[in-house]
């Protein structure tokens, strides 16, 4: 008889539980540091700890050899003040084409610039891995990196004109 808690389209329940247990100390450390941190299942059906901050977002997951930390900053509404919908759409399309070229000079291999459709602005995503034994360093790392990622977003926006 099969386990009633098992759903083929979902990750193995045991794996999710293990990841949740492994990530719980990270969630607690982030909260103790003043972040709003919570556990959730991400878009790839992996357990992660999500952090929402005024400067950006962070997601912490179990990576290949440690904690995978994805940091993201987005500047919303780059062309929101553009009155003409046609002109706003044209500028958005041009920004999507220019972002990869413009970002080459600013970003490291573990960083990527995007056009965020939901927020209608430039975003930068940085993905790094931190060893399991350095889990207590994650809150300070997130606090240090989010402003720097926000600076990258601003530089890319400036280049887009």
Regions found by a protein language model. Name each.
Residues 12, 18-20, 98, 157-161:
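A short amphipathic beta-strand at an alpha->beta junction
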Residues 74-125:
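Short, internal acidic amphipathic alpha-helical interface segments
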Residues 50-55, 71-78, 127-131:
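Secondary-structure transition/turn motif
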Residues 140, 144-161:
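Mixed-charge, glycine-accented linear interaction segment located at domain edges/termini
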